[in-house]
């Protein structure tokens, strides 16, 4: 009593405390960062190494394996995968959530250093690492185009200046430049001219390397002066290399220009990038795992004007893709939904109270509770994201409940004629324990979420804490500010009486009367009602087992990613044509705003595309509908496939794949893996539950196998090293020298003229100078034949791996796909030497599926313990928890009706329903127990009276929660696919629960009361001797 009086009789202090909470919340709101979702990125580091010209198998065995053995010893590595292709190896290290990425980076560098002595000596540079996940979609893509500058010059500008500057911006993890390569001097050799002049390829390489050196020359000085010695030992341009003497034939000088075409070109001519229909250089910017995407994008945009000033007028710099607009639009939609929810909740209160003064009280309590929560969010290091704002939207119905319960009870005393301050004191004292029970038991629901580990726990933590803080502030407001405002604003007596005799009040009285009559009938037929309770329990279990499930709702972020996979023997020229064809088809779609893409590099038969869709208000289709439409058009392109997927805010794992979900095959027997992977992929592609099935196993590339005749080589004076050097010099784009410039270093690249590499006959023109100085054709000591070879070699851990990727067809869920894959693997009879498991998002889904039931049961158990402690009873908590099955049935039926799978968002809704629907039972049980203790009523009379007396606050709180969630169901626009499952679950559960628990709770209360009396009688009987 003294606690309530302290605030009721000191209105100024109470108002100032509430104002302080509000001001702190406003300050916290202004300081909170903005993000699409809570920070759930795994720390990921990518290690890259190159050895130009080396086959994928050579890269895997000589580069990837030594690095993997060293990197695998690092503590906290969750998963290590690698992919080796032509001349390139990339290793992805995914660390545990609690691992600091900077400390992990230091360990990675130490491991690279330790493995350095085991790596091939011919590597042009040491392995490097980046603190970025290559499988993440770029947060921004910039393009450089020009009608004046060459692609190599644009690439040089992008790589040397723009990428370096952008990489220094806070939050940027990696800037990947694509579409070409650095400028270089290319030496395209003429094999016939070399043979005629008697010059070997190795002699040309040596001559070029010796002619371009950078060494210190020292200085001269006398007693008064000092002169730095400088020579013309460096060659900078193709024109400088052209007259270089590489050999003497019969006393005549053979110059480089006599046996080769020397040009200013690029390091790797097998690269192409495009934006819409124009050649372009792409800067793909990815954020650090722990960085905020909005802040990072804003920082980049703030630097763009400065970067524009450094760009020559003939170069056009454009933003081709930006992830932030749809994120901002989604958050604006949630904020609008929050405002609408607050307005609807206050409208519900007004309809019940029909008094402006009375409505003002919860109208003040709700914003104070919600705004005050922002301060706690800031202190906890949270962000304004879709989940935290949805938590506040749902909290609207919660926080008003406490104020309603207190206000309604005080109003009841005022209508009985009690003075306002006395009514405020008496009313708040009567329901203080009820409000405390409701709030504590609601917060208890979220304790298991706070203890949940892994990605789901990280994802739900902000939601749970935000909602719990809002409920806690609401509890404080309802026991302090609300009674004070009731005591000073409301009046007693007749002014409140007519509210029950007009309009909605008359309707409510009529409904309450009908409820009383029907409740009498239900109490007389309690066995039938008991069967209904048991039926809802069984139905809720069956619905949960049968409903389709997925990890997270498929988002429409307005951005698509596409992976091109062509025939494994395709040439770069043909692949570039495929890229152009695909981009033309996509550009013609009415929903597409911008398309960029690139191909080439170490994977000649693959490419990537990034598609920006028009804003939601300018297109009628969702991202998935656009994909379905494009899929039909793209299927007609022969020799290549383009796999499209919508970019999601959550993507787990570091594997780059052409689809959203992955299933990985592992084996220590590479031949078994290569035998079974095609069979498994074919079986999965036939499943209707899967779409866009593809694999990263590419072991059918065209290869030319050369077999040396070692005896002949020995007789002719030719070593294997001589022969290998010949092939590397001729076909490996060998980097033979370095050109040093003020801002960067460039390479001299040597290979035979492309005109001689169009078919296998080029090998007939190759020759080696033997130890006697005679040219020996390759065909004299080697034979060759076509064969198949892998285009890439993949590892997970230290085992050979192949990842099958897939998307979900429209109307299918991840649970259906997972079950179909498991059935297919069983039917195929895959041997134990080949192990299959889900990876990435699909793996997290499997783990979440196993934890969902435990999580729900843990929440129920926690609520039972809290209620048992509060009521000092084992029985009454069971009565209160009997409301849950009907809510579960309503929620799951609503998801089925709206064709929405059960996702992590729907799980949040179920957890919320556990907290919401028990409030009705708490209000009934509290008043029934009070009536039994102080009113000398029988249990039947007590529960009947409690149901009638609490009917109005029960209806008010339920409708407030329902209307608070209704905007989530009805909302459209950006991000609605996240909001709708939560709203559908809550509204469906509330409707079903309200229809049933008003009748089932009294019956369950009486059942447990009779059970309690029966046990007490048995325990009180004397034991016979």
Curated annotation (Swiss-Prot):
InterPro entries noted in UniProt: AcrB_DN_DC_subdom, Acrflvin-R, Multidrug-R_MdtC
Family of this protein: Belongs to the resistance-nodulation-cell division (RND) (TC 2.A.6) family. MdtC subfamily.
Subcellular location: Cell inner membrane
Quaternary structure (record): Part of a tripartite efflux system composed of MdtA, MdtB and MdtC. MdtC forms a heteromultimer with MdtB.
Coiled-coil annotated spans: none
Major site of localization recorded for this protein: membrane
Organism: Klebsiella pneumoniae subsp. pneumoniae (strain ATCC 700721 / MGH 78578)
Keywords, comma-separated and alphabetical: Cell inner membrane, Cell membrane, Membrane, Transmembrane, Transmembrane helix, Transport
GO terms assigned for molecular function: xenobiotic transmembrane transporter activity
Gene name as annotated: mdtC
Protein name in the entry: Multidrug resistance protein MdtC
Membrane topology of this protein: Multi-pass membrane protein
Residues annotated as transmembrane: 15-35, 333-353, 360-380, 387-407, 431-451, 469-489, 528-548, 851-871, 875-895, 897-917, 953-973, 984-1004
Any Pfam family: ACR_tran
A GO-annotated cellular component: plasma membrane
Tree of life domain: Bacteria
């Amino acid at each position: 009593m003294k606690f309530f009086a302290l605030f009721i009789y000191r209105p100024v202090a109470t108002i100032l405390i509430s104002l302080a909470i509000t001001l702190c919340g406003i300050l916290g709101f202004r300081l909170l960062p903005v993000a699409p979702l809570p920070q759930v990125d795994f720390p990921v580091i990518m290690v890259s190494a190159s050895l130009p010209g080396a086959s994928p198998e050579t890269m895997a065995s000589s580069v990837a394996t030594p690095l993997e053995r060293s990197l695998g010893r690092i503590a906290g590595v969750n998963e290590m995968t690698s992919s080796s292709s032509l001349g390139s190896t990339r290793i992805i290290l995914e660390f545990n959530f609690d691992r600091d990425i900077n400390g992990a980076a230091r360990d990675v560098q130490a491991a690279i250093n330790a493995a350095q002595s085991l790596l091939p000596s011919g590597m042009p540079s040491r392995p490097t690492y980046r603190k970025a996940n290559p499988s993440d979609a770029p947060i921004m893509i910039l393009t450089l185009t020009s009608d004046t500058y060459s692609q190599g010059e644009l690439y040089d500008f992008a790589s040397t200046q723009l990428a370096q500057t952008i990489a220094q911006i806070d939050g940027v993890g990696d800037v990947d430049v694509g579409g070409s390569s650095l400028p270089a001097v290319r030496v395209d050799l003429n094999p016939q001219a070399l043979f005629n002049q008697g010059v070997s390829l190795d002699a040309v390489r040596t001559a070029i390397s010796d002619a371009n050196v950078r060494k210190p020359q020292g200085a001269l000085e006398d007693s008064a002066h000092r002169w730095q010695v400088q020579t013309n030992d460096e060659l900078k341009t193709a024109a400088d290399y052209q007259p270089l003497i590489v050999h003497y034939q019969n006393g005549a000088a053979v110059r480089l220009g006599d046996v080769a075409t020397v040009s200013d070109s690029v390091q790797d001519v097998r690269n192409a990038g495009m934006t819409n229909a124009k050649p372009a250089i792409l800067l793909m910017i990815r954020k650090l795992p722990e960085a905020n995407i909005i802040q990072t994008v804003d920082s980049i945009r703030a630097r763009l004007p400065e970067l524009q000033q450094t760009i020559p007028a003939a170069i056009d710099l454009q933003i081709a893709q930006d992830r932030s607009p749809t994120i901002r639009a989604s958050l604006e939609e949630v904020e609008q939904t929050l405002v609408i929810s607050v307005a609807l909740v206050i409208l519900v209160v007004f309809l019940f109270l029909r008094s402006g003064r009375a409505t003002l009280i919860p109208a003040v309590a709700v914003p104070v509770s919600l705004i005050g929560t922002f301060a706690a969010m800031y202190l906890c290091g949270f962000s304004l994201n879709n989940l935290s704002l949805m938590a506040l939207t749902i909290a609207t119905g919660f926080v008003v409940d406490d104020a309603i319960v207190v206000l309604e009870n005080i109003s009841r005393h005022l209508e009985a004629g009690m003075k306002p301050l006395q009514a405020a004191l008496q009313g708040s004292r009567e329901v203080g324990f009820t409000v405390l029970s409701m709030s504590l038991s609601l917060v208890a629901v979220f304790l298991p979420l706070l203890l949940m580990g892994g990605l789901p726990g990280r994802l739900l933590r902000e939601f749970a804490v935000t909602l719990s803080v809002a409920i806690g502030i609401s509890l404080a407001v309802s026991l302090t500010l609300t009674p004070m405002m009731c005591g000073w604003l409301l009046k007693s007596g007749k002014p409140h009486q007519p509210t029950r005799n007009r309009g909605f009040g008359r309707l409510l009285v009529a409904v309450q009367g009908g409820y009383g009559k029907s409740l009498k009938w239900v109490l007389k037929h309690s066995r039938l009602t008991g069967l209904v309770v048991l039926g809802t329990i069984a139905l809720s279990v069956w619905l949960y087992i049968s409903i389709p499930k997925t990890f997270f709702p498929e988002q429409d972020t307005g951005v698509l990613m596409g992976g091109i996979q062509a025939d494994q023997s395709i040439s770069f020229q043909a692949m570039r044509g495929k890229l152009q064809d695909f981009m033309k088809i996509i550009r013609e779609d009415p929903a597409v705003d911008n398309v960029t893409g690139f191909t080439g590099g170490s994977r000649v038969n693959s490419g990537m595309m990034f598609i920006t869709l028009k804003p939601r208000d300018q297109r009628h289709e969702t991202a998935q509908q656009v994909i379905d439409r494009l899929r039909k058009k793209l299927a007609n392109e022969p020799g290549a496939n383009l796999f499209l997927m919508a970019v999601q805010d959550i993507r787990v794992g570091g594997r780059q794949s052409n689809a959203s979900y992955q299933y990985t095959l592992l084996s220590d027997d590479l031949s078994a893996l290569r035998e079974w992977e095609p069979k498994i992929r074919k079986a999965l592609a036939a499943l209707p539950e899967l779409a866009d099935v593809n694999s990263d196993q590419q072991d059918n590339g065209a290869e030319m196998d050369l077999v040396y005749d070692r005896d002949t080589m020995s007789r002719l004076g030719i070593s294997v090293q001589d022969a290998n050097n010949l092939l590397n010099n001729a076909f490996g784009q060998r980097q033979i020298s370095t050109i040093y410039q003020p801002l960067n270093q460039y390479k001299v690249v040597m290979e035979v003229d492309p005109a001689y590499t169009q078919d296998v006959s080029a090998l007939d023109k190759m020759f080696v100078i033997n130890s006697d100085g005679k040219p020996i054709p390759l065909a004299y000591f080697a034979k060759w034949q076509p064969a198949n070879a892998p285009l890439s070699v993949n590892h997970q851990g230290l085992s050979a791996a192949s990842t099958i990727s897939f998307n979900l067809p429209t109307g299918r869920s991840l649970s259906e796909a997972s079950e179909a894959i498991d059935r297919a693997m069983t039917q195929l009879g895959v041997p134990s030497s080949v192990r299959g498991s889900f990876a990435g998002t699909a793996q997290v889904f499997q783990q979440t599926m196993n934890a969902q039931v435990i999580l729900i049961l843990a929440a129920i158990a926690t609520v039972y313990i809290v209620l048992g402690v509060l009521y000092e009873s084992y029985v009454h908590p069971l009565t209160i928890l009997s409301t849950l099955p009907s809510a579960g049935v309503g929620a799951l039926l609503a998801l089925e009706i709206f064709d929405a799978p059960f996702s992590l968002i729907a799980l949040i809704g179920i957890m919320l329903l556990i907290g919401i629907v028990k409030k009705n039972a708490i209000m009934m049980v509290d008043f029934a127990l009070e009536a039994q203790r102080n009113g000398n009523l029988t249990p039947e009379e007590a529960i009947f009276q409690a149901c009638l007396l609490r009917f109005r606050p029960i209806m008010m709180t339920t409708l407030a929660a329902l209307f608070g969630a209704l905007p989530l169901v009805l909302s459209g626009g950006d991000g609605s696919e996240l909001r709708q499952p939560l709203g559908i679950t809550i509204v469906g559960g509330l409707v079903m629960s309200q229809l049933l628990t008003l009748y089932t709770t009294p019956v369950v209360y009486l059942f447990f009361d009779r059970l309690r009396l029966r046990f007490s009688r048995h325990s009180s009987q004397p034991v016979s001797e």
